Amino acid sequence: MVYISHPTEYGTLYTKQELADISSVCREYEIPLFLDGARLGYGLVAETDVTLKDIANYTDVFYIGGTKAGALCGEAVVFTGDSMPKHFLTRVKQHGALLAKGRLTGVQFDALFTDDLYLEIGKNAIETAAVLKEGLKEKGYTFYIDSPTNQQFVVLENRKMEELKKDVQFSFWEKADDTHTIVRFATSWATRMEDVEKLLSLL
């Protein structure tokens, strides 16, 4: 199996052509292509030429992330064409992955897929991330990666990072050098513009 994520852990996105090329190689060698869609709601509304239809066309299985889009739990697994393995539902049950009262997970996706809510709340993350990105640029911060998604990777002085820890939640990513660290700021469906403004004021 070939396993890819869209968006990736680094906040990057595949292009439609890249997805088509990977799919072509996988199909030539009869290797299933799996797309991790934990952040799919953010990837679909970021600046990209990849649509949900493209993902369905080029992959054998993907999942639509729920927890990163406001659901209490659950992801929606989608098998394309006739790619679902034999006895898949039985295997799910035998391996302890079938939730009792699983319809409660389904109800969340029913709500998320109504009136494009899934995409609308994804837009909030992208819009707030764009404001954060622009504000950081204006303050002279360096970016480790140019991400069009809700994940922004910023190089901070170690001293500034330690100060920021007192008031802000963010992810340590890796050391840039002895005096600088790369951190990740991630916006979400719930991020407010005032949250972004507060963060920028602390930087």
Across the structure, where does each feature detected by a protein language model lie?
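Active-site phosphate-binding strand-loop segment of PLP-dependent enzymes
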Residues: 1-37
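Buried hydrophobic positions in well-ordered alpha/beta secondary-structure cores of metabolic enzymes
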Residues: 2, 22, 35-36, 76, ...
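Active-site pre-lysine segment of PLP-dependent enzymes
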Residues: 16-24, 28, 39-61
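Short, solvent-exposed amphipathic alpha-helical segments in soluble enzyme
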Residues: 19, 78-81, 93-94, 168-170, ...
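Generic structural signal for well-ordered alpha-helices
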Residues: 19-23, 129, 200
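Conserved C-terminal alpha-helix-loop-beta "cap" of PLP-dependent enzymes
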Residues: 130-131, 135-203
